[in-house]
Amino acid sequence: GIKIAYPSNGADLKGLLKAAYYDPNPVVILEHKGLYWSKVKGTDAARVNEPSEDYILPFGKANIVQEIWEQETNETITVITYGMGVHWALNASTTMKNQVEIIDLRTLYPIDEEAIFKSVKKAKKCLVVTEEPTNNSFARSLAGLIQEICFKYLDAPVMVIGSENMPAIPLNSTLEFTMIPNADKVRLKMEELLEY
């Protein structure tokens, strides 16, 4: 019965916290410290107006942050992410907004499979963005599920971008920057997938 949430902005955090309060089962809410006061460059989208006092966000309901229409002539992709990955994807897609649909999962369990599969079938290509090392990760598992369910709709393999597979985050800031994804790395992966 455990639920896992990972919001990308303060409004979602408030709604998920209230949902956790009313849920009879255990809930784990993860949050990225870089999103506090939007102090990391490129996270301006995390600054949102506080929702009403009664705002509750249901578990298992993803948010389409950037939507595209089905296109026959252009290559398109769906980016599935959560937390800080939402902001990397938004910043990475500034020059290709009409080709990139971005889905913020909000909750990792339960997961909104319906929204994911619908978007992937429309875009025909998928990139899963995470901050965790990709070996044996949630993102790899999700990519495998998408590949299995949406295989006949895909024009390319489902790709994953995450941290380098190292045992820990280095203390050296240069090494840390090298290890962790950012908007530039995500943009390069998007371009690679669009050209596939």
Where are these regions (language model features)?
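Conserved thiamine diphosphate
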Residues: 1-23, 163, 194
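Thiamine diphosphate
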Residues: 33-196
